[in-house]
Amino acid sequence: MSQEEILQKVCSIVSEQLSVESGEVKSDSNFQNDLGADSLDTVELVMALEEAFDIEIPDEAAEGIATVGDAVKFIEAKKG
């Protein structure tokens, strides 16, 4: 899976989970500051990403994922 494919899938999941237009979701979008996610939204988003990509995102790692790009980099590293 290429970085672009991961980005598209992450953007789609973020758009759906946070109820924002897909055009608003960019690689540098911050989940809380730009997309209005609260802490519960963030937990649900992490769970959705884990399920969609069949990976585990430890709590420590999840705390470091603040933007769409951060999520893509983490997933890319996990999927190797």
Curated annotation (Swiss-Prot):
Transmembrane segments: none annotated. It is found in: Cytoplasm. One of its GO terms (molecular function) is acyl carrier activity. It holds the Pfam family PP-binding. The keyword Phosphoprotein applies. 4'-phosphopantetheine is transferred from CoA to a specific serine of apo-ACP by AcpS. This modification is essential for activity because fatty acids are bound in thioester linkage to the sulfhydryl of the prosthetic group. Residues 1-79 form the Carrier domain. Pathway: Lipid metabolism; fatty acid biosynthesis. Keywords: Cytoplasm, Fatty acid biosynthesis, Fatty acid metabolism, Lipid biosynthesis, Lipid metabolism, Phosphopantetheine, Phosphoprotein. GO terms for cellular component: cytosol; membrane. The modification O-(pantetheine 4'-phosphoryl)serine is found at S39. It comes from the Bacteria. InterPro entries: ACP, ACP-like_sf, PP-bd_ACP, Ppantetheine_attach_site. One of its GO terms (biological process) is lipid A biosynthetic process. HAMAP family: Acyl_carrier. Carrier of the growing fatty acid chain in fatty acid biosynthesis. PANTHER family: ACYL CARRIER PROTEIN (PTHR20863), CARRIER DOMAIN-CONTAINING PROTEIN (PTHR20863:SF76). Belongs to the acyl carrier protein (ACP) family. This is Acyl carrier protein. It comes from Prochlorococcus marinus (strain MIT 9515). The lineage of its organism: Bacteria, Bacillati, Cyanobacteriota, Cyanophyceae, Synechococcales. The gene is acpP.
